[in-house]
Structure formats: C-alpha cells, structure tokens
Amino acid sequence: MNLFDTIRNTIVPIHKEGYVFVAAFFVASLVLGWIAEPLFWVGLVLTAWCAYFFRDPERVTPQDDDLIISPADGKVSAVQSVVPPLELELGKEPMVRISVFMNVFNCHVNRAPVRGRIVNVAYRPGLFLNAEVDKASEDNERNGLVIETSHGKVGVVQIAGMVARRIVCWVKPNEPVDAGERFGLIRFGSRLDIFLPAGFEPRVSVGQTAIAGETVLAEFGSAKGPVLSRRG
C-alpha cells in the first residue's frame, strides 16, 4: 500500500451534501481572518467541525433478511408500540417503533435498515420541536418511506429537530435498496423512527448507542433479548 492509499483509508470521507457548507465555512474563515487574524483560527475550527458533521464513513452491514439494522448513528431513545403515521399507509394497528436520536456530533447519513423495495415515500411539513420528545413524531417536519421485504413492510421516518431544518431523501418508489445502503441525510440534529412488521422482536434497549448500518435493532422470530452494539 502506497502513501496515497494510506491517507485515503485513514481520512473519513465527507458526503457531497456537505461540500457547500464546508466551503462556505472556509471562505467565511478567510474573510474573518482578513478582519482579525484570531478570527481565522476560530473559523477554521468551525470548518473542521462542519466537515466532521458531514463525514460519511464506510460501514460493514450484516446481510441477513431476518435482521433490521439501525438506519442512523445515535442513541436509542424509545422502544414502544404505537400507531404508525397515516402517510405511511401501514394500517391503524399499533406497531413496535424504535426511535434513534441523533445529536449534532453524530454522523447524519441515513442507511436502509433492510433489503427490499421502496413502495412509499411521503413528506409531511411540520414544526421543529426537540426531536427527543414524543410529540415530535406527530408534529415535526418528517419524511417517511416504506420498504417491502420478505417479512413484511418496514417503515422508516426521518424527523427534523430544533436545529435540523433540512431533510434529504434520495430514494423513490419502486427502487430496490440493500441493507446499509445510503438513502438520505438530516442536517444538524434529528431522529429516525423505525416501525417493525409483525414477527420482529427488538434487540436493543433505551439508552443504547446505535451505529448506522451495523447495529442490529430487531430480529425476526427472536426472543434472545438486546444485542449490545459497539460504542464509538
């Protein structure tokens, strides 16, 4: 392995959605530095933070149709049975919902939790409440998608928060997705809700750290209890 390959494998790439923000922060740093040199260094630190926020590391995703993988980095904030949002068209019966809260220091690239086919994508405008509170699921701006799998339909909802004001989703109905495939991004703090079809049992608990594309959230027919994810 040459030096270029070593550097490339060491530095975590930045997602293209962040290019314009990183560039804007850097230009602002140059302008501030022209006014007063110490401000340049402050701006440079903020530029580095922006690049860190939009990082897009590679993940090794389990390829098992019996597993539902976390679509987001963050903390498991809720595991409960609720009626899914109407726009998902998943019916009026309660489903198990696992919520993963992302703070401003988490990687915000979202990944498909399962392999399947996108059958519904539904955007709903709303408020920008704290994404950790339960009301955020009903009142906040959100974007939902439904993935049809061999075990039923899995619902995934991107929810904006107080700081997050931009939900990005790249997939469309009838497109296939693989587990761990990038499907969207939410800028600057937010939450992901995952609705489990019948037959899946949660394998995480509230307060546990989740890693997008790696942490097992649920397993089909499982009664084994929580799976501990690695923390990072």
Swiss-Prot record:
GO biological processes: phosphatidylethanolamine biosynthetic process
In this UniProt entry, the residues modified to Pyruvic acid (Ser) are S190
Q: Where is this site: Cleavage (non-hydrolytic)?
A: G189, S190
The free-text cofactor remark is:
Binds 1 pyruvoyl group covalently per subunit.
Q: Which cellular component, as a GO term, is one annotated location?
A: plasma membrane
Q: What is its EC number?
A: 4.1.1.65
Q: What is its main location?
A: membrane
User: Where is it located?
Assistant: Cell membrane
User: What cofactor is needed?
Assistant: pyruvate
NCBIfam families, per the entry: PRK05305.1-1, PRK05305.1-2, PRK05305.1-3, PRK05305.2-5
- Tell me, how does this one assemble? Heterodimer of a large membrane-associated beta subunit and a small pyruvoyl-containing alpha subunit.
In its UniProt entry, what is this protein called?
Answer: Phosphatidylserine decarboxylase proenzyme
Q: Which gene encodes it?
A: psd
